[in-house]
Design a protein with these regions (language model features):
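ATP-dependent adenylation/nucleotidyltransferase module used to activate substrates
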Residues: 2-194
């Protein structure tokens, strides 16, 4: 799908969006089976809407919530108010992740760029990413002095937080159960999601 197709679909009326969503849900369940799928549920608006649509068709489909320990108590209570929700937890705590890997700052993309540029710099490698963060290359969203200072920050910078606290527990759940997720991701939210 290209950006023009995406823009066209974003302008569909709500009824058509819901209909297309239900068609995709049906196809997913037809392929994997009702017992072979689950809804990845964060308690946020996107996954709550997805859970509602999925369960309007298949009331018994499981939801899985990764409790990172960083959620507001109200979100955890909201998640627990739904039936058939499995709560999983990461192996590492947030404190351990930031101590071992570094802090997530600015965005996942910037944190990732800083993490690997710093690693390459420490290894004596001159990479494009490093030059971009140092402001020596043009044509990059990271080619800004405001991000370059993070290379010299007195703390580690990393995008590992989301991977360790959310993605790894979900991958482990998939490996243990063989189930595949429905994931609610809005294209309008950030460059990574487009």
């Amino acid at each position: 799908m290209d950006m023009n197709e995406l823009k066209l679909m974003q302008n569909y009326p709500l009824e058509l969006k819901v209909m297309k969503t239900k068609m995709r849900i049906q196809e997913w369940v037809d392929y994997y089976g009702e017992d072979g799928v689950y809804v990845s549920f964060s308690g946020g608006k996107d996954s709550t809407v997805l859970l509602h649509i999925v369960r309007s068709m298949y009331p018994n489909i499981e939801a899985v919530f990764s409790n990172t320990g960083l959620e507001f108590p109200e979100i955890v209570e909201f998640v627990k108010s739904f039936d058939n929700v499995t709560i999983i937890k990461p192996e590492k705590s947030f404190k351990r992740v930031i101590t071992e890997e570094g802090y997530p700052v600015v965005s996942k993309a910037v944190s990732n760029a800083v993490r690997y540029a710093k690693k390459n710099e420490e290894e004596g490698k001159d990479t494009l990413r490093l030059r971009q963060l140092r402001g020596l290359e043009k044509g990059s969203k990271f080619n800004k002095a405001k991000w370059g200072f993070l290379l010299d920050a007195p703390f580690k910078v990393s995008d590992a937080c989301c991977e360790e606290l959310k993605k790894k527990p979900m991958k482990k759940y998939h490996k243990e159960t063989g189930k595949v997720p429905f994931i609610a991701t809005m294209a309008a939210e950030g460059g990574v999601r487009k």
